[in-house]
């Protein structure tokens, strides 16, 4: 049976369809997935704990990589000179947020001032010119500061608890690290106060490690502090092995060194710091502005002691010090 439809009804139906179709089309368009750019001067292997903590914070806020957010990692693999190029690539892509880890905050600020940036900083970010104020960072940058330079004097104190006769204290650092100068100054002041002499060895690449230890040995170094540079995580095994070969009690800035056989580590709890970075990134993705998020001052540190290494060196940790350790490796 033919269906008879009047002109008025036809036009009404046509008009309804024409009005509905754009709404349907818009509803069918997929929502753009925000992209987070994650830049670090180290490597994926060395920063695994930090990345896990960062992703955990995002997950707690409802973001999962590969589902409703995409994280693009850019690793410099120990070459700080590559960081500006990695940042420039993310700026060109116009990512939603940039995470500037491992001392790359200054380079991130130079790369762009419009994309939100969440950084980690081992020194005072105000003194570095990263933000004008911790409480009111303003602009497009905020982050987490853990003032790792201030940890050097405490590392020296801990080292002298187990090696009290050491007069010359070695300090191995990476010459290209942005905070190297600040760390040396802090340690020199602390060493002089305690009547010790700081002997500095700068390392530029892995082939410098063995000559640096030979030089420290010739200079009569009795104990050693190894800087918490991201690059050194890649070289932790040769650094720990050479400290053992030269029978040097050593304190490191990162837990991974003690796990690898180093005597002890004392430094910022980096996973905790990167968890907070993840919290801030999630808040920015949800609409908050970096200018309104105060820079977090992380005070959480971790002390890890390796008793097996202490026994090999003929050293004994005082019981009060063992009681303060966050982790004791036996």
Can you say where each PLM-predicted feature lies in the sequence?
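Short hydrophobic alpha-helices and adjacent helix-cap/hinge residues
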Residues: 1-330
């Amino acid at each position: 049976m033919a269906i008879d439809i009047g002109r008025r009804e036809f036009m009404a139906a046509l008009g309804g369809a024409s009005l509905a179709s754009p709404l349907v089309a818009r509803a069918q368009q997929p929502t753009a997935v925000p992209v987070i750019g994650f830049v670090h001067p180290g490597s994926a292997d060395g920063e695994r704990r930090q990345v896990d903590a960062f992703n955990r914070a995002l997950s707690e806020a409802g973001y999962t990589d590969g589902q409703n957010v995409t994280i693009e990692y850019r690793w410099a693999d120990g070459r700080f000179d590559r960081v500006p190029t990695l940042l420039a690539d993310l700026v060109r892509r116009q990512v939603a947020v940039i995470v500037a880890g491992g001392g790359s905050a200054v380079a991130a600020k130079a790369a762009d001032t419009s994309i939100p940036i969440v950084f980690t900083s081992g020194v005072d970010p105000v003194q570095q010119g990263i933000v004008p104020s911790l409480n009111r960072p303003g602009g497009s940058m905020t982050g987490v500061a853990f003032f790792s330079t201030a940890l050097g004097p405490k590392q020296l104190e801990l080292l002298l608890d187990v090696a009290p006769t050491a007069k010359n204290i070695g300090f191995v650092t990476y010459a290209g690290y942005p905070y190297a100068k600040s760390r040396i100054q802090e340690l020199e002041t602390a060493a002089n106060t305690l009547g010790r002499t700081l002997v500095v060895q700068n390392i530029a690449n892995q082939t410098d490690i063995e000559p640096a230890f030979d030089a420290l040995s010739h200079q009569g170094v009795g104990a050693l502090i190894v800087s918490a540079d991201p690059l050194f995580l890649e070289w932790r095994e040769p650094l720990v092995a050479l400290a053992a070969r030269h029978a040097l009690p050593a304190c490191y800035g990162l837990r991974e060194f003690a796990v690898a056989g180093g005597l002890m580590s004392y430094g910022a709890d980096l996973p905790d710091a990167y968890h907070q970075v993840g919290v801030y990134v999630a808040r920015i993705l949800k609409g908050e502005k970096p200018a309104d998020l105060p820079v977090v001052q992380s005070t959480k540190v971790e002390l890890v002691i390796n008793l097996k290494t202490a026994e090999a060196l003929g050293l004994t940790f005082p019981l009060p010090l063992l009681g303060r350790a966050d982790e004791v490796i036996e």
